[in-house]
Amino acid sequence: MLPRNSHYKGTAYVHGKASGPLIASNLELSFWGGVDPQTSQVIDHHHPLSGEFLQDAILAIPSGRGSCSGSGVLLELLLSGKGPKALIFSRREDILTLGVVVAEEIFGRSIPVVVLAVTDFEELLAARYVAVNGGTVSTVQLGDAMHSPEDDSTEPLDTTLGLSIELSNKDYAFLSGAHGQAAQAAMRIILRMAAMEGARKLIDITQVHIDGCVYTGPASLKFAETLRDWGGKVVTPTTLNSIFVDQRRWRAQGVPSVFGEAAEKLATAYTDMGALPTYTCAPYLLPSAPKRGEQVAWAESNAVVYANSVLGAKTMKYPDFLDICIALTGRAPYGGLHIESNRSASLCVELPVLQKADIDDSFYPLLGYHVGRIAGSRIPVVVGVDVLRPSRDDLKAFGAAFATMASAPMFHIVGVTPEAATLQDAIGRREGVECIRLDVTELQTVWRTLNSAEDNSPVDLISLGNPHFSIAELRRLASLCRGRAKHDKVAVMVTCARATYGLADQAGLIEELHRFGVEVITDTCWCMIGEPVIPTTSRTIMTNSAKYAHYGPGLTGRRFYFGSLARCVDAACDGYFDTKMPGFISSCIPKGAGVR
């Protein structure tokens, strides 16, 4: 039982006053794919808060996780009046906080954001009503008058623009408005985030990947068009993430014009500012992918993880909207994973001895999902994968699943990723690294989680390409389909980048896939696709993406199966999926233990 009117002193990352009922969980939550931007309902079916409405409540979670688009969802909620009244975290949180900062800087809307000590946060979880004033959070018992406490926070955050940060002449010019109103607003937002991160200076960035081009609702469009109309122009090479629709085919697909036109307007606002219409969630497959050590600013959770982990480039997990701010100025906070010493692992996950012949490609997303859940905000190093010789596509699948569950922006795999030639390289000088020995049987829990559909349900749709398929994956898909016949009641769809589609078309793969019955979609990705692209009659979806198997039930209202690419093709031909676990899991489970 909490003492009556307990007071907790924390750090106010965004100042303000609020009071209301507390909705709380000790599990991180991704707002994109986890919260409906129109209603505020938690739609992540795997989360303890599933079904709750955040409107007019105080939300307490340790941090966000998963998608960089959480800032966009929160902006939608705040501008429509359906958002929470305050956010309380147990550690610094960038994505959701940035959504509040943008709402305040651009639209004059705001809510308090407070970070409490872990012990105080955990105690607060038992409260029913709370009040926030600056950095102070007070519990309010049922029947008491709702009030805001006096702000006696002992740790005020200095967000005075530029005063605590070393600025160059160029930075001052942006801040003074010498380069226009859009760049000025962008620099203000960058400096506020830099202060929150404890950065002492800004650095030049060689390229930006923008995730804010994802249409989350009217607010995302209003934000982009405002910057464009204020004269915004990117000053560094900038690519665009997947958008809400296949820009060249959405009308033929029957997408309602209210959504299709809004998505096109949003994409156009960014291309008007000079961004390239790459429209892919896998920018690491583009020729412009950064090299090891390159300082970049990428958004899109799977892309961030891949850039840091597999390419060895340096980027923070940038929230939507901060990405375009950096593109308009070419400057980013020098903090987080931009700094070499912050890239070392604090968690070691050791695998048992496995052989490549023992596994299939479902192993990597299952493992990534599990490691991400264990790691949380910690950077992990995985030992024992090198003998399996994972491909770049295997690492893509691992990273996307990892990024779904973790808030950490990178991982290491000893003998595989560039900064982990040895375990010592990955750990560096860090002390007190926790070591966990993983049992492959632990993956059975992940398998059951991702296979949320009932056993032996008919499969209606095979969903592939989350993240976007590579040319190698399209080639393998064509090989698996060759000489076989698709079930006439199963649709098969795969998403990829325009550039990848062009290469596949030249190689004759698109025609071959079409003959089997595969529809290849560009520009968009599965986390944005809804009806009627997903047929209204499709009730059960199968995918080889752990990311989509996690988010899909909440985003689509459908049941999901997860399995390897080969088993997806089998289901496309048979019309059903046998949910029997892969041999690399089932062979390790003691007889009589029961296997689904």
UniProtKB/Swiss-Prot annotation:
Keywords noted in UniProt: Iron, Lyase
InterPro entries: AcnX (IPR012047), PMDh-L-like_dom (IPR007506), PMDh-S-like_dom (IPR002840)
UniProt KW Lyase keyword: yes
Co-factor requirement: Fe(3+)
Keyword Iron among UniProt keywords: yes
Reaction equations catalysed: cis-3-hydroxy-L-proline = 1-pyrroline-2-carboxylate + H2O
SUPFAM superfamilies: LeuD/IlvD-like
Catalytic residue positions: 67 (proton acceptor)
GO molecular function: lyase activity
Summary of activators and inhibitors of this protein: Inhibited by Zn(2+). Not inhibited by pyrrole-2-carboxylate nor its derivative 2-thiophenecarboxylate.
Enzyme Commission numbers on file: 4.2.1.171
Function: Catalyzes the dehydration of cis-3-hydroxy-L-proline (c3LHyp) to Delta(1)-pyrroline-2-carboxylate (Pyr2C). No activity with L-proline, trans-4-hydroxy-L-proline (t4LHyp), cis-4-hydroxy-L-proline (c4LHyp), trans-3-hydroxy-L-proline (t3LHyp), D-proline, cis-4-hydroxy-D-proline (c4DHyp), trans-4-hydroxy-D-proline (t4DHyp) or L-serine as substrates. Because of the low catalytic efficiency, C3LHyp is likely not a main physiological substrate of this enzyme in H.jecorina.
Subunit (UniProt): Monomer.
Family under the similarity heading: Belongs to the AcnX family.
Protein name: Cis-3-hydroxy-L-proline dehydratase
Organism for this UniProt entry: Hypocrea jecorina (strain QM6a)
